[in-house]
Amino acid sequence: MSATASVATRHDWSLAEVRALFEQPFNDLLFQAQTVHRAYFDPNRVQVSTLLSIKTGACPEDCKYCPQSGHYNTGLDKEKLMEVQKVLEAAAEAKAIGSTRFCMGAAWKHPSAKDMPYVLEMVKGVKKLGLETCMTLGRLTQEQTQALADAGLDYYNHNLDTSPEFYGNIITTRTYSERLQTLAYVREAGMKICSGGILGMGESVDDRAGLLIQLANLPEHPESVPINMLVKVKGTPLAEEKDVDPFDFIRTLAVARIMMPKSHVRLSAGREQMNEQMQALAFMAGANSIFYGEKLLTTKNPQAEKDMQLFARLGIKPEEREEHADEVHQAAIEQALVEQRESKLFYNAASA
């Protein structure tokens, strides 16, 4: 963090104010975002997470963007919940190549009572490896939320996806208020929140602004804000949707950074379609977190060694864990910058 004066954290953003941010000249917007970013973060550090699909396919939700929905024929087979030991093996590999947070995702509307004990064991096991833990399991009850917190879960991911106004065009099987209720349960249980959205689903700029307003006007900002670019998958209703303009995507990252100055803004799904120049602009706009590994649940992600090569060219280093920044782990992270390793344990949910 630089000596730049801290920027006030707000929870009262209006649509007119956020529109004005989006309408700034591109260079002015990036300058403002970078100034805000430097007030709270080292601009040359990026937090690195790994995401694993622990249960794939046949989700009862009808999210139009998702290849895991049981409503669409995307060629993705239904798979059972992964064994706890296999999850821990993948987590150990993730740590070895530099990840500091391990995220586990399941294609559920909500976790069942029979699966919860295994999920809790996954959390406990990953924590013992010295990694931060994150899960995305769908809607939670208050009791399930507390059980995850008691097991030591650090983050819970539950995206809002888009604005309340556009939401009904994308999902009908879960309400916006249900998503907000799950986030409230997570906060009440003392866990950190990971929540963001997706660009490229046919939404307007006002919808992008509306999503960010919902997140920034929560009583506390999410600690992590993933901004996804739609990955178009054949068989889903959004497979033929128009591509997001790269500059519009960067603008959204920059506005998210300005509105939520203390949050990690994650450059999430869609990086496979981004060239190195676009990713560099994303970091300039204030993105300071990425998913690292071969897969994002069921879609491609840039290979880990390519990420580290890009980091080296840009002078970026992976962010250390504040609580567990031991010398051995940091040395492994630094070594990953110069080595080219292939991950053999990342779960490829879409493989034939």
UniProtKB/Swiss-Prot annotation:
Cofactor details (free text): Binds 1 [4Fe-4S] cluster. The cluster is coordinated with 3 cysteines and an exchangeable S-adenosyl-L-methionine.
Any GO BP: biotin biosynthetic process
Positions of the Radical SAM core domain: 44-262
Enzyme category, top tier: transferase
Cofactor: [4Fe-4S] cluster; [2Fe-2S] cluster
Positions that bind [4Fe-4S] cluster: 59, 63, 66
InterPro entries: Aldolase_TIM, BATS_dom, Biotin_synth/BioAB, Biotin_synthase, Elp3/MiaA/NifB-like_rSAM, rSAM
EC number(s) recorded for this UniProt protein: 2.8.1.6
Keyword line: 2Fe-2S, 4Fe-4S, Biotin biosynthesis, Iron, Iron-sulfur, Metal-binding, S-adenosyl-L-methionine, Transferase
List of residues binding [2Fe-2S] cluster: 103, 134, 194, 266
Catalytic function, reaction form: (4R,5S)-dethiobiotin + (sulfur carrier)-SH + 2 reduced [2Fe-2S]-[ferredoxin] + 2 S-adenosyl-L-methionine = (sulfur carrier)-H + biotin + 2 5'-deoxyadenosine + 2 L-methionine + 2 oxidized [2Fe-2S]-[ferredoxin]
A Pfam match: BATS
The protein's annotated pathway: Cofactor biosynthesis; biotin biosynthesis; biotin from 7,8-diaminononanoate: step 2/2
Example of a GO MF term: 4 iron, 4 sulfur cluster binding
UniProt function note: Catalyzes the conversion of dethiobiotin (DTB) to biotin by the insertion of a sulfur atom into dethiobiotin via a radical-based mechanism.
PANTHER family linked: BIOTIN SYNTHASE (PTHR22976), BIOTIN SYNTHASE, MITOCHONDRIAL (PTHR22976:SF2)
Family: Belongs to the radical SAM superfamily. Biotin synthase family.
Subunit structure: Homodimer.
Protein name, entry field: Biotin synthase
